[in-house]
């Protein structure tokens, strides 16, 4: 595995801090409370790329499992038994997918960044809802119907998460044009061309 440069380590550390901070920024919407955690996992993939984005999010998850209170309800290895832990695992794959998608094929654009985010959102929902359903029904003995899990963990969460996808695409494009972006070697020429 390729060694990380100082810049890459700093950016990974920055995103670990941003994801942690976003977890505790609570925005009340009606009877629900939303955080900015998803926004920063989206940006981790877009800005850092597939490999580093996944590394940054995985490091955040590992810190929480080691007991550092970076999750919404604390931390520690027992957190894997939380119904919502599947979302944390899914964020790793989501960051990888976002970074991979925007660095393959066509030039980077707002639309391409948004598609990467929406694809990542689907990944998070599929894994997160499945984990929530399985843990609720077979681990903590708090059974819920699958439809209820889909409704409360997916359908009702989709509008605010879609807004975060829109915001992350805009911020990601600004980062791309300003050079705050990890560019794979074979895409450097394309990056310079778009930013020119």
Report residues per predicted region:
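Hydrophobic transmembrane alpha-helices
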Residues: 1-56
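Short, charged juxtamembrane terminal tails flanking transmembrane helices
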Residues: 1-6, 176, 180-196
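Interfacial aromatic-anchored transmembrane helix boundaries in multi-pass membrane proteins
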Residues: 22-34, 59-94
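Residue-level recognition of membrane-helix boundary sites in multi-pass small-molecule transporters
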Residues: 40, 51-52, 85, 112, ...
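Short helix-perturbing small/polar motifs within transmembrane alpha-helices
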Residues: 10, 14, 77-126
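Membrane-embedded alpha-helical hairpins and interfacial helices in multi-pass inner-membrane proteins
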Residues: 109-188
